[in-house]
Amino acid sequence: MSFDTMLIIISLLLLAGGVGKRTLDRSGVSRRAGVSFFIVLAALSHFKLSLSDGVRISPACITAAVWPLVFAFRKRAACRAPQLILPLAALCGITASALMPYVGGEGGALFASVLTSAAAGALAGLPFGLAFSGSFTLFLITAGGVAEALESGIMFLELTNGALACQLAGMLAVCSCALIKQTLRTSVRTYSDERTVK
C-alpha cells in the first residue's frame, strides 16, 4: 500500500467519524475557514514574485503566516497588543518566503511561515491556546505532505493529505491543551493540599 493510499483511507475514516470537525472547532478554526484557507494556499503556491538577486516572495507563505492570526481579532480583548497581530504575521510570511532557497524550497518556507506566525501570536500577547492551536493545525498541514503533493499537481492528493494533516494537528493541539490544563490543575490541587496539611 502506497503512502498516499494510506493517507486517503485514514483521512476518509477520520472524516466519516466526524473527527475533523470536532478537532477543528476545538482548535479555534472552523471547517469552512480551514477549507477556504487550504484552497487559497493551493492556488497561491503556483505563483512567485521574483525580486532582485534571485530572491522570490511567495504569496502562499504570506497567506500561511497571516491566516492563523486573522481569526484572533475575534478574541482581541484578550490580547495585550492586538495592533501588532497582522504586521507581525505579514513580516513573518515575507521573511520566510524570502528565505525559501535556504529552508528546503516551498515546503520548508511554508513550514517556517506557520512556525514564525505562532511566535508572532505569542509576541502580540495572544493566549496560548489561541496563538498556537490554530497555528499547529496549519503547521502540520504543510508537514503532512502538501508541498510534495503540490509539486505533483494532483489536487485530490493535495486535499486528502491536507485534510488528514489538519485533523491530526487538531487532535494534537486539543490533546496538548488538555494535558497542560490537567497538569496545571494537578499542580494547584497538590499545592493546596500541601498547605492544608501544614
Language model features by range: what are they?
Residues M1-K21, G125-K198:
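C-terminal transmembrane helix-loop-helix hairpin of multi-pass membrane proteins
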Residues L14-S27, V66-C79, A122-G125, I180-L184:
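C-terminal ends of transmembrane helices
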Residues L24-S30, L51-I57, K75-I85:
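Interfacial helix-loop-helix linkers and transmembrane-helix boundary segments
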Residues R31-V55:
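A generic, lipid-embedded transmembrane alpha helix
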Residues I39-F47, L91-L99, T137-A149:
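Aromatic-anchored segments of alpha-helical transmembrane domains
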